[in-house]
Amino acid sequence: MASSSVFAGLAQAPEDPILGVTVAYNKDPSPVKVNLGVGAYRTEEGKPLVLNVVRRAEQMLINNPSRVKEYLPITGLADFNKLSAKLIFGADSPAIQENRVATVQCLSGTGSLRVGGEFLARHYHERTIYIPQPTWGNHPKVFTLAGLTVRSYRYYDPATRGLDFQGLLEDLGSAPSGAIVLLHACAHNPTGVDPTLDQWEQIRQLMRSKALLPFFDSAYQGFASGSLDQDAQSVRMFVADGGELLMAQSYAKNMGLYGERVGALSIVCGSADVAVRVESQLKLVIRPMYSNPPIHGASIVATILKDSAMFNEWTVELKGMADRIISMRQQLFDALKTRETPGDWSHIIKQIGMFTFTGLNSDQVAFMRQEYHIYMTSDGRISMAGLSGRTIPHLADAIHAAVTKLK
């Protein structure tokens, strides 16, 4: 008979609010169930997609007899780091040309944020980070556990289902000088609401005037508009003024490498000399955390980014994914219009990227799960990438019923 465990007093932890949606979905035997919780792209048939260019890159790596499985340096694959910085900042970026960027390979977006957060907690004079309200559910946990104090700034206006720009400016305007500010580079998660370029410029001016430190999270480059350059405009605006910033990048969404955990943290510094020292300190954060990053996913990304034909093939496939999501938005909007669902649903086609913040409340979300077997997070966020022409009528029926029966 097993003896009593020293961990017997542990409480059962709750499911993750996002990943827990899939756990519940998997337990549901219904043939009409739809999972709109997790941000992973699905084909029109509802299947996970591996990009053709990714399969080709993997095959090339497998067929290369000189390829080995040795440890990478603490900072990761050098080619991957250079190409990642170039992708987000632009090939002609002055920061890159002047060697002012320290880039390290990390474990996708989450790992990049955590390494950046721990670096700031150790080496930056201000320990407070302002994050948008709402934001991705993991952001506050990542930064709190990294040793930072988390505050929020207004971002989303439920009344307009758009940006609360005035509230954003007021909150950042009253933040202490030098505070860190988390910014979603594009396709804000969970709202799908982004500032215009004019608004970005006002945000930049305000932040630089108060010496607020930008920390960008770029999880969807190319996925919002279908253009890699267009989706990086906000970031490049901040780099162009010569100021410093942090940038967390992920290839989970735009290359479909969810399970490979491929990402990068770049810190744009004031000089090349500072960048060298920053990199040396990033190594001291990474080494006791996970020693060094995995080789396979980064090799796939580097193979694609350094070959012009493969890069072009990737941009075509990426635009195809972005365009399908835009089409899903239009189809859902049209379906609700046809049903004469109460309310204004134009925000569905105005918002961009993988997610739509529907405006549905938690009771309506629970009703749709119970009655229609539709799974989403309790805040009403749906992953447009999980929809198809086949499932849209079912979702529209569910939304119509929820809005009609529950206020």
Swiss-Prot record:
Coiled coil: none annotated. GO terms for biological process: 2-oxoglutarate metabolic process; alanine metabolic process; aspartate metabolic process; biosynthetic process; glutamate metabolic process; tricarboxylic acid cycle. PROSITE patterns: AA_TRANSFER_CLASS_1. Its cofactor is pyridoxal 5'-phosphate. Important for the metabolism of amino acids and Krebs-cycle related organic acids. In plants, it is involved in nitrogen metabolism and in aspects of carbon and energy metabolism. Homodimer. In eukaryotes there are cytoplasmic, mitochondrial and chloroplastic isozymes. This is Aspartate aminotransferase, cytoplasmic. It comes from Oryza sativa subsp. japonica (Rice). The lineage of its organism: Eukaryota, Viridiplantae, Streptophyta, Embryophyta, Tracheophyta.
